[in-house]
Design a protein with these regions (language model features):
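Generic N-terminal amphipathic, Lys/Arg-enriched alpha-helix
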Residues: 14-31
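N-terminal, Lys/Arg-enriched amphipathic/low-complexity engagement segments
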Residues: 27, 35-38, 45
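N-terminal glycine-rich anion-binding loops that anchor highly charged ligand groups
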Residues: 41-45, 52, 56-60
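Conserved small/polar residues in nucleotide/adenosyl-binding loops
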Residues: 285-290
Length: 290
């Protein structure tokens, strides 16, 4: 899907990949990251976020949780990393990279809670009251206070296989009351995934039903007196989609493939702001023609 795009929009990276592989500088089965292009993309995304009042946590799991790029992004002004699984969070902690949102797709296991919570993430996503209680207990023991993001589910939401879980809207009020009784934690926001996806027929990034679920959950929390909530509305976050996030009332995005210019939107739009920023180098052997 992206080979034509990267050949058209980042020819120097393609030429370098071929040259280095042929000269033995890199081995086959290597991901080659274009540091400068990734940072250019990140700068465009941050500028769009700043202009629209949307804060972005950067996601680097697609490019190996690269700490060098993570440090450059924090130096650029990004608040921190979104770590959808605990291994990514631990990698960032070990490299002194600030944590933004942790646990959105894979909940933090109990054995990793102390190390990750000591790093003081901006917010931690929880699917269940059991996980909220675990975080409350660890924060109480460590003398910390942690904001929690509630992953919410609504009827008709789009969910990927293996990524089910969260608080259904009809149980949200009782869940919030239970969390309000827990020490050292507080509800700080709501999220779902994916809230936006590229639609090939429309040739554009469009909102998913999940977005309305997040909006409804936020309305329910505001009715309970909550203010300054984080509405995290990820997937396909890039310069093009950030105004959509803002228009929907979202406060946060999570650019990942947007940073490398490799969302489906970028494959179909050669005029997109972000350019392809990485390449997979491999060898393909073909039999000679008879």
């Amino acid at each position: 899907m992206f080979l034509k795009t990267v050949m058209e929009r980042n020819q120097p990276l393609v030429r370098l990949g071929i040259e280095w592989q042929q000269n033995g500088v890199i081995l086959p089965d290597t991901y080659l990251l274009d540091y400068d292009t990734i940072l250019e993309n990140a700068r465009s995304i941050k500028q769009a976020g700043d202009a629209n009042g949307v804060q972005n946590f950067f996601m680097l799991k697609q490019i190996g949780r690269n700490p060098l790029i993570a440090r450059a992004l924090t130096d650029m002004g990004y608040v921190g990393a979104v770590c959808v699984d605990f291994r990514e969070a631990l990698t960032m902690v070990e490299n002194q990279i600030p944590l933004g949102n942790v646990g959105h797709l894979v909940q933090i296991p109990r054995a990793a809670l102390k190390k990750i919570l000591r790093a003081k993430p901006v917010i931690v996503t929880v699917y269940t009251l059991e996980k909220a209680r675990e975080i409350s207990a660890v924060c109480t023991e460590l003398g910390l206070h942690q904001k929690l993001m509630l992953r919410v589910l609504g009827e008709g939401d789009m969910l990927y296989s293996g990524q089910y879980g969260g608080f259904e809207l009809q149980e949200l009020d009782s869940a919030v009351r239970a969390i309000e009784a827990m020490p050292n934690v507080e509800v700080g926001g709501v999220c779902s995934f994916p809230c936006f996806l590229y639609d090939e027929a429309a040739q554009d990034i469009l909102p998913m039903p999940n977005l309305r679920t997040v909006q409804t959950a936020a309305e329910m929390l505001r009715a309970r007196g909550y203010r300054d909530l984080m509405l995290n509305t990820p997937s396909a976050t890039c310069t093009h989609s950030i105004p959509m996030i803002a228009a929907a009332g979202g406060t946060h995005g999570e650019p990942g493939h947007g940073l490398t210019g490799t969302t489906p939107y970028h494959a179909g739009h050669p005029d997109a702001e972000e350019r392809p920023g990485y390449l997979y180098v491999c060898l393909l052997y073909t039999s000679p023609s008879p």
